[in-house]
Amino acid sequence: MSNINYAPTIWSRADALKVNENDPTTTQPLVSPDFPVMSDTVFIWDTMPLRELDGTVVSVNGWSVIVTLTADRHPDDPQYVGANGRYDIKRDWEDRHGRARMCYWYSRTGKDWIFGGRVMAEGVSPTTREWAGTPVLLNDKGDIDLYYTCVTPGAAIAKVRGRIVTSDKGVELKDFTEVKTLFEADGKYYQTEAQNSTWNFRDPSPFIDPNDGKLYMVFEGNVAGERGTHTVGAAELGPVPPGHEETGGARFQVGCIGLAVAKDLSGDEWEILPPLVTAVGVNDQTERPHYVFQDGKYYLFTISHKFTYADGVTGPDGVYGFVGEHLFGPYRPMNASGLVLGNPPAQPFQTYSHCVMPNGLVTSFIDSVPTSGEDYRIGGTEAPTVRILLEGDRSFVQEVYDYGYIPAMKNVVLS
């Protein structure tokens, strides 16, 4: 279907050694432990603003819409009540992934979100878990394609089409009833469950390439191959300093940012392409990849964790980025290391699952914030929005806004 040739960009161990967790220009400001919670009845985490295929965050008839991974809170469930008779919110929070559902929220102000409910009714999605993706407004009729990940059994990139209906009182997402599976990991470019039982394959983010006008999608994957068989060679090492040639068990970390191209703009048929960026020997997770197109450059962002780094390299939970002049690369790690926005060392788990929007605003959710002593407070709610400035290959943290502030860049009036 396509005749596309390119070599993946390698995020090397030498690049990762440049990560500086104490650089104030790439550190997310501290989140206060007295943060507000947007709901007492549900946890939210990965947040997906409604957008168009060029990345523009949109409102519809004046209503902003976000989709979130959502799970009920269980304060009265006996399995989450500790020996002291109190609600064990930590365990409830840690169990959320197995019951993740796509839910939506709406707002007139780009904050103060009102809960709308499930996007898909129970039983519509073919798997037990609904994991992250991207909601795309297709036209001024209100049609929406929700790209997402069907997980357990297996993991597949899928989409479901529905529509948005608005009134003076609120928003309804309707008719999301038929899920179309698009593709799964192929074993040639992307690791399968058979090759590695803890494989990663998820988080579709479709976009129109501003240069060729075609519909593509980035997603999280792992480089294909049986677990433990990958080689951390000279290219994966990069120009490391003396004493850093030993890689330990780094061959087990094989994250990558994947790419696929659609047959046409309907997005119903896709061809899997080689990864754009590989992190063999550096990191095992490159979650929720997405683009910002600015100043003739392709800014490719992803999120990752400290605990998924390979032996001998480390970095904070947060946003990592790569920049290039062409979709197919080559890319350069932003700020020389790849780190764009990391949690502060004093609060290493305060936020995660950042989404960088074309206006420079970055949304994320609150995970856990230290309170006193060894105690901490679980979030499961929107974090303060921050703004970053992109200048060439560099980025700078600029401002902090309200919790969950996700303003529309454009309002679409339905015909």
Curated annotation (Swiss-Prot):
According to the UniProt record, which cysteines are disulfide-bonded? none
Alphabetically, which GO biological process terms does the record hold? carbohydrate utilization
Write out the catalysed reaction. [6)-beta-D-fructofuranosyl-(2->](n) alpha-D-glucopyranoside + sucrose = [6)-beta-D-fructofuranosyl-(2->](n+1) alpha-D-glucopyranoside + D-glucose
Where, subcellularly, is it found?
Answer: Periplasm
In the induction comment, the record states: A phage-associated promoter element (PAPE), which includes the first 48 nucleotides of the gene, is present in lscB and lscC, but not in lscA. It probably explains the lack of expression of lscA in P.syringae.
Query: Function, please?
Result: Catalyzes the synthesis of levan, a fructose polymer, by transferring the fructosyl moiety from sucrose to a growing acceptor molecule. LscA encodes a functional enzyme in vitro, when expressed in E.coli under control of the vector-based lactose promoter (Plac), and it can restore levan production to the lscB-lscC double mutant. However, lscA is not expressed in P.savastanoi pv. glycinea PG4180 under standard conditions. It could be an ancestral Lsc variant in P.syringae.
Miscellaneous notes for this chain?
Strain PG4180 contains three levansucrase-encoding genes: lscA, lscB and lscC. Of the three copies, only lscB and lscC have been shown to be expressed while no expression was observed for lscA under the tested growth conditions.
* Name listed for the protein in its UniProt record: Levansucrase LscA
Organism listed in the record? Pseudomonas savastanoi pv. glycinea
Lineage of the species this protein comes from = Bacteria, Pseudomonadati, Pseudomonadota, Gammaproteobacteria, Pseudomonadales
